[in-house]
């Protein structure tokens, strides 16, 4: 028969951010355990609140399947002596299998006879298997762990109760001194201890005791309650999914309500108001029909509507000091100038092994100028970029950012506009942090994008220069994310920047700007190059591009990230062409033979007087034309190279490359090396797998 099993782990209240990952982890571990134990099931339903993680497993089999196996033992010549008596080896083997020598059979394996015992292993009942779950539960990992009592067990929070029900029967086990049973706990304040009659009654039983255990149903209820409030008041709400998820994991019985605050606080910038309400109080902001913030908020309590007026007043009361602080910071911050804030950055450390934040800005200003000129920015754009680069961290020393660190960059833009900076300069101050995650929004302005690249590039080069290079999962300064951000910006903009060799250009620029750097920015340049190539691979692995295509295009002498990105995309776009295999095989044959020529390409000269066959002249003309036309894009270069396939085939048919005559041999190698050099702009095509 199909069985239903309920497992509930009751704990002291977990932090909201670990509730969802924890139930997902428990689900995965229990499912893996059951599969390893050969127990089948239909599906697993998840339940989670701040005080519990629960799984309802449907369609469990009654027991493990029995196993009949033939167990191989020692060879016959070892199992029996010369007189045919059983040896200790045979007796020991059968004893270990729970059998006797009378059960022995001989079977031939590759011409040698071996002892075999047919063994029947009866499957355990599902209840017996489920008694092994304590080891699964206690093996869970969490960002932070707690100990309690006089034991060594560590868990996210102390375990206070366990429910283990197979249909309507308790499956007994314990974790420390907590015995599994059928008693669960209702809502902390509205509920009470309650027994669950059978596993399928779990959700309804808790619902009757003021606990909505299903996360999705609880979240939908919160959304419905908030929607009702905003519809009644003709408001709009900022549906912040992260905030909704957090609130959902803070409550077991949600009740949404609206509160208000003094309209004078609406004079604060929207991001300040939103942060004060969202991050500190977990309030949802509301707006009028035109999108303007209103002096109201929506919150969610963990309880019912009893004494709701008192709850509303309490929430309104605790918000006032937050808004008062924000108003004070906002007013005080405007009493100083940007230059005064910049001066304070001399006492703010970027990193104690590298420099102050002020010195970082000086470096970034130089890097930004180098990048801006390479991108042919106008004089006005270069001036705006230079101004932004010299002040873009100033808000770090304001009181507002000191209190609300998440507003860095945002307050920089707001204050910069208040102090009269140009809009492009102010926007760049905010955008230089972008993207703030792997999928985060990219800078929308040209100045912001260049500043974002310059800032991240300085961080990467600086940390590499002092040998603080990410390894394994260790990346405390998020250098991988910053490098990935640079790659994404370049991909988005299509900018051609020789970033993989930029270090050699920056050091002289520092000297010209009379900026002293206490470390060698050229140090570990090869590692920096590899670091960026790995981020390019990461980008295209995420897009499910074939590994061999990525490996081919990143095994290159290119320094221009945009060209490498284009090479990957170009090869991927044409991989299914009818003649793709033929073209790649022709080019890779050229690449392989050209490796025998150790001379620098810059020194190679092809002498037409040494040609013996028409195909040599034809190859020479075709390659010369290809170089002369100097295709502007990687895709154009690749297309031009592919037109050479019949010429290459004819060339190899007519010519012995490694001719006995040294001059002829070197001339032919020179021809192939020059062509190989052109092909290497695409990448190492030899890495491609063609079928």
From Swiss-Prot:
Annotated GO MF terms: arginine-tRNA ligase activity; ATP binding; glycine-tRNA ligase activity
Subcellular localization: Cytoplasm
Pfam families on file: DALR_1, tRNA_synt_2f
GO BP field: arginyl-tRNA aminoacylation; glycyl-tRNA aminoacylation
Subunit structure comment from the entry: Tetramer of two alpha and two beta subunits.
Protein family according to the UniProt entry: Belongs to the class-II aminoacyl-tRNA synthetase family.
The protein's name in its UniProt record: Glycine--tRNA ligase beta subunit
């Amino acid at each position: 028969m199909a069985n239903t099993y309920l497992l509930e782990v009751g704990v002291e209240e977990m932090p909201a951010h670990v509730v969802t990952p924890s139930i997902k982890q428990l689900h995965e571990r229990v499912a893996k355990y059951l599969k390893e134990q050969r127990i089948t099931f239909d599906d697993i339903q998840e339940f989670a609140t701040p005080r519990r993680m629960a799984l309802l497993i449907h369609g469990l089999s009654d027991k493990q399947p029995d196993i009949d196996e033939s167990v191989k033992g020692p060879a016959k010549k070892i199992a029996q002596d010369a007189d045919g008596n059983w040896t200790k080896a045979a007796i020991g083997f059968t004893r270990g299998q729970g059998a006797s020598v009378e059960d022995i059979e001989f079977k031939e394996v590759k011409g040698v006879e071996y002892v075999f015992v047919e063994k029947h292993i009866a499957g355990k009942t599902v209840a017996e298997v489920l008694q092994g779950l304590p080891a699964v539960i206690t093996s869970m990992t969490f960002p932070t762990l707690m100990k309690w009592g006089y034991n060594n067990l560590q868990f996210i929070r102390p375990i206070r109760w366990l429910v283990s029900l197979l249909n309507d029967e308790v499956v007994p086990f314990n974790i420390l001194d907590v015995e599994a049973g059928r008693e669960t706990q209702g809502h902390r304040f509205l509920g009470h201890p309650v027994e669950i009659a059978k596993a399928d009654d779990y959700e309804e039983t808790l619902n009757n005791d003021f606990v909505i255990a299903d996360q999705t149903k609880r979240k939908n209820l919160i959304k419905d309650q908030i929607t009702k409030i905003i519809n009644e008041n003709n408001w709009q709400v900022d549906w912040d999914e992260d905030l909704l998820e957090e609130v959902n994991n803070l409550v077991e019985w949600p009740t949404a309500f609206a509160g208000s605050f003094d309209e004078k606080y609406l004079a604060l910038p929207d991001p300040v108001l939103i942060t004060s309400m969202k991050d500190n109080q977990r309030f949802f902001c509301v707006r009028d029909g035109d999108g303007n913030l209103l002096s109201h908020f929506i919150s969610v309590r963990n309880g019912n509507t009893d004494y709701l007026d008192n709850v509303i007043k309490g929430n309104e009361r605790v918000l006032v000091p937050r808004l008062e602080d924000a108003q004070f910071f906002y007013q005080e911050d405007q009493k100083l100038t940007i230059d005064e804030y910049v001066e304070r950055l001399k006492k703010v450390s970027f990193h104690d092994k590298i420099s102050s934040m002020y010195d970082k800005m000086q470096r970034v200003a130089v890097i930004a100028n180098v990048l801006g000129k390479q991108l042919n920015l106008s004089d006005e754009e270069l001036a705006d970029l230079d101004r932004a680069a010299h002040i873009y961290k100033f808000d770090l020393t304001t009181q507002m950012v000191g209190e609300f660190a998440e507003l860095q960059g945002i307050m920089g833009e707001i204050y910069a506009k208040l102090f009269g900076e140009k809009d492009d300069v102010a926007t760049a101050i905010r955008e230089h942090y972008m993207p703030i995650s792997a999928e985060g929004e990219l800078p929308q302005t040209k100045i912001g994008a260049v500043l974002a690249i310059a800032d991240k590039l300085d961080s990467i080069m600086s940390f590499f220069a002092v040998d603080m290079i990410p390894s394994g999962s260790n990346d405390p300064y998020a250098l991988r994310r910053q490098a990935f951000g640079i790659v994404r910006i370049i991909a988005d903009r299509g900018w051609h920047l020789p970033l993989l060799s930029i270090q050699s250009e920056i050091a002289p620029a520092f000297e010209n700007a009379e900026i002293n750097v206490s470390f060698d920015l050229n140090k570990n340049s090869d590692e920096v190059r590899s670091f960026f190539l790995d981020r390019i691979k990461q980008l295209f692995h995420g897009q499910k591009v074939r590994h061999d295509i990525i490996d081919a295009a990143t095994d290159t002498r290119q320094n221009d990230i945009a060209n490498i990105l284009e090479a990957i995309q170009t090869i991927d776009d044409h991989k299914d062409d009818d003649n793709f295999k033929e073209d790649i095989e022709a080019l890779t044959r050229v690449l392989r033979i050209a490796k025998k020529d150790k001379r620098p390409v810059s020194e190679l000269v092809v002498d037409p007087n040494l040609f013996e066959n028409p195909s040599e002249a034809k190859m020479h003309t075709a390659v010369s034309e290809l170089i002369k036309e100097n295709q502007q894009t990687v895709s154009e270069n690749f297309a031009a190279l592919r037109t050479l396939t019949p010429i290459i085939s004819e060339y190899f048919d007519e010519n012995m490359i490694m001719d006995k005559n040294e001059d002829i041999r070197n001339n032919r190698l020179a021809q192939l090396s020059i062509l190989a050099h052109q092909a290497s702009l695409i990448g190492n095509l030899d890495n491609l797998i063609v079928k």
